[in-house]
Design a protein with these regions (language model features):
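Short, low-complexity, Pro/Ser/Thr/Gly-rich segments in the mature regions of secreted, periplasmic
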Residues: 684-688
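Long, contiguous interaction/targeting segments characteristic
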Residues: 9-12, 25-27, 220, 278, ...
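Low-complexity, acidic Ser/Thr/Pro/Gly-rich terminal tails and inter-domain linkers that flank the onset
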Residues: 45-66, 361-384
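N-terminal secretory signal peptides that target proteins for export/translocation
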Residues: 1-7
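Bacterial N-terminal signal peptides
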Residues: 12-22
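Short metal-binding segments enriched for Cys and/or His
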Residues: 239-244, 324-327, 350, 553-557, ...
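A eukaryote-biased signal for short, well-structured alpha-helical docking elements
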Residues: 27-51, 335-369
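Extended surface/linker regions that mediate inter-domain or inter-protein docking
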Residues: 66-307, 384-642, 650-653
Length: 689
């Protein structure tokens, strides 16, 4: 890659190179450990790395309050290796403009209050609100290379409480686009008690919990990162001006994540902050799964606050049809304050689905009363071309007790086996007597034969095609009905499924080859918690691809090959930019807002392939893969790599490029440029930091 440096940088090279030579020469090994394939700097040549020293880290060393209320903070600006950076961008490229916050938690309270606020008025002049904000006009002093002292312009009041927990926060950016290295962002917080002692900051959720779905929690242009910084302003003190509603984190976050399921939205209203409408948000998991955000394993100091400290603000954010003043939708019990909440809403009661916090948020299909269903596939006999394969499997409940398959005959109970192959590429094998593209599914409950130990056999009624070659696979799905709290006013009828299992076998005596693994169900469940579809039947990506293969479509509307479908659904509302949509039957996924945040702080960023992909699988397909039926794409059928990429890259110019690189005789030439080691490898082109 050839870089063109500005005249300003050519003029100061002598100074810069002297500094760099003495302090910042990095080895190739250091480069690889300092950056990831998600970073633009990972792909820069070593000379550029040595010269620019990309990256930005902010470290707050200390904070002090003088007798007259003057606040100062000692901080460091460093690159990825911890070497100091020039704030002004003279001796190291990229000027840095840090911003500063300060807040405290009043004694006896639990949320931050900012010392610095501003007033904002709505455009019609009818609403004026208070907002926490950052300090401006302070004085910067350099202490050492990369170390600075900032003295706030805002003085703390004489009545400030030195025994209270205080927090200073910083955020900033470093623009390195001149070197094709993007913009680096960073933030930091520092807690202390001015009078001495251990601070007790608010810590209900840690950023690591947010990042499971959001990848990198960042807002307001990208530099404000991490929940620890967010809650300094997003607390009860702050409201947005357009409608005067609070942007307190516990209210705002609950409402955004509840989104389309808010009672007020279901009733026809909307939830918006300024001009951004969050009413279409569909949480990737069930919003009753409070513990997926409120994780007890992260070390958050108040991780259990969600069930030990209920409040009208937090609970009413999701349950926004409750009127606490009148008691409407609250069993006619008005609540003038939060003092009585925990009297009824205890952490956990004796029964599921009761008024306790944890009980009320249980998903019926995950009830502890469910006996469970566990299936293991043991072996396949008679699995040769032209034969009827017999599957040996175990069928038990979670306590290890055998399940009679006769109890699974009547819907919604079931057990079914699906046969598919070859594993090199599903979707093009024709099974006699069925119209399903590339696979055959059989209900097995009535014909399964089981012993007293729960070991069963089932013989498929459809044969493996006579000319079949290579490896085939058989997968299982099963489901049981469940009634929770039968005979009570809380009775709920539901169903739950087994974890799909897959077994591979050779139909021609050749070595068994499993189907390629591209994504990992565990990665899906980082966001979806339990990816379970089609009536609690299908929950493992290894099994999903049986049916979601290159030959399968949703009528004449869309291709449902797994790569096309998942890319299209996750790309969601980005499709509108290209003037396209993605539908499966009547379900329109064009308003899906992917939860990952871009480097500039906006949701809908789909560039981090490894949020779903296994390492190294975000790559072009080998030559010779089956074409993909995809009515939603401009090319139908589409070559394998084209189909996967065009699900996101949907424009006509994108498609023209892909078509031009596909020869009718020799196929796609994507690997020439986009292979793992290509100049424009897939992962390199998706690097966004």
């Amino acid at each position: 890659m050839r870089l063109s440096y500005s005249r300003a940088w050519v003029g100061c090279c002598a100074v810069a190179l002297a500094v760099i030579a003495g302090a910042a020469v990095l080895s190739s090994a250091t480069k690889k450990t300092a950056f990831t394939p998600r970073d633009k700097a990972y792909y820069a040549d070593q000379n550029t790395i040595n010269f620019v020293r990309p990256g930005l880290k902010i470290t707050i060393v200390s904070a002090k309050i003088a007798a007259d209320g003057t606040l100062s903070v000692d901080y460091k600006l460093t690159d990825q290796d911890g070497l100091g950076l020039d704030r002004l961008g003279v001796t190291t490229p990229g000027a840095i403009s840090p911003s500063f916050l300060v807040a405290y938690i009043p004694t006896g309270q639990t949320q931050f209050v900012s010392y610095v606020t501003r007033q904002r008025t709505s455009t019609d002049g009818k609403i004026t609100v208070t907002q926490a904000t950052g300090d401006t006009g302070g004085v910067q002093t350099q202490v050492a290379d990369g170390e600075y002292l900032y003295t706030y312009a805002t003085k703390l009041p004489k009545t400030y409480d030195p025994a209270a927990t205080h927090r200073v926060g910083m955020y900033g950016s470093r623009n390195l686009t001149e070197f094709d290295l993007g913009t680096n962002y960073a933030s930091a917080v520092f807690d202390w008690v001015p009078a001495g002692g251990k601070p007790t900051p608010r810590e209900v959720i840690k950023t690591v919990s947010c990042d499971k779905c959001h990848d990198q929690l960042s807002f307001h242009g990208g530099s404000r990162r991490g929940l620890e910084l967010c809650i300094m302003c997003h607390q009860p003190q702050t409201s947005e001006a357009s409608a005067g509603q609070t942007v307190d984190m516990k209210v705002m976050a609950h409402k955004i994540h509840m989104g389309s399921q808010l009672p007020s939205v279901v009733a026809g209203g909307k939830y918006a902050i300024g001009s951004t409408d969050w009413s279409t948000v569909v949480l990737p998991s069930d919003p009753r799964r409070c513990a997926e955000c409120h994780e007890s394993t992260t070390g958050a100091a108040q991780a259990n606050a969600w069930y030990t400290n209920p409040s009208r603000a937090a609970c009413g954010a999701c349950h926004d049809n409750v009127n606490f003043a009148t008691g409407l939708n609250h069993v006619n019990l008005p609540q003038v304050d939060d003092n009585g909440c925990a009297s009824c809403h205890i952490p956990k009661g004796e029964l599921e689905l009761d008024a306790s916090i944890q009980g009320a948020h249980i998903l019926p299909q995950e009830s502890a009363t469910a006996p469970g269903i566990v299936i293991n596939l043991v072996k396949v006999d008679n699995g040769a071309a032209g034969k009827l394969p017999t599957i040996t499997f175990t069928l038990k409940d979670k306590a290890g007790k055998p399940i009679d398959p006769a109890t699974l005959v009547t819907s919604p109970n079931k057990i079914s086996f699906v046969l598919v192959g070859p594993t090199t590429d599903y979707g093009n094998t024709t099974f006699a007597g069925v119209t399903t593209p590339g696979y055959v599914s059989e209900a097995a409950a009535a014909l399964s034969k089981c012993g007293q130990d729960g070991t069963c056999t089932y013989t498929m009624t459809h044969a493996i095609p006579a000319g079949a070659k290579g490896s085939f696979a058989i997968g299982v799905e099963a489901r049981r009905a469940l009634v929770v709290l039968p005979g009570t006013v809380k009775q709920v009828s539901t169903q739950y499924g087994v974890d799909n299992k897959v077994i591979y076998f050779s139909v021609d005596g050749s070595p068994v080859v499993k189907r390629r693994a591209v994504v990992d169900t565990a990665k899906c469940n980082q966001c979806h918690v339990r990816l379970s579809l089609h009536g609690e039947n299908r929950n493992q990506t290894e099994y999903c691809v049986f049916c979601h293969n290159p030959s399968n479509t949703s009528g004449t509307v869309s291709g449902i090959n797994f790569a096309v479908m998942v890319h299209s659904i996750h790309f969601g509302d980005n499709l509108a930019t290209a003037g396209t949509t993605y539908k499966i039957g009547t379900a329109d996924f064009s308003d899906v807002r992917y939860p990952a945040f871009s480097n500039t702080g906006r949701p809908g960023d789909t560039t981090n392939c490894q949020m779903c992909h296994l390492p190294g699988t975000e790559a072009v397909f080998p030559i010779g893969m089956n074409p993909v039926k995809a009515p939603n794409l401009l090319m139908d059928p589409a070559p394998a790599t084209t189909a996967a990429c065009a699900a996101c890259h949907t424009t006509r110019s994108n498609m023209a490029h892909m078509a031009a690189q596909t020869d009718p005789k020799f196929g796609e030439s994507c690997d020439v440029c986009h292979d793992v080691n290509g100049q424009f490898s897939v992962i390199k082109e998706h690097a966004g930091k």
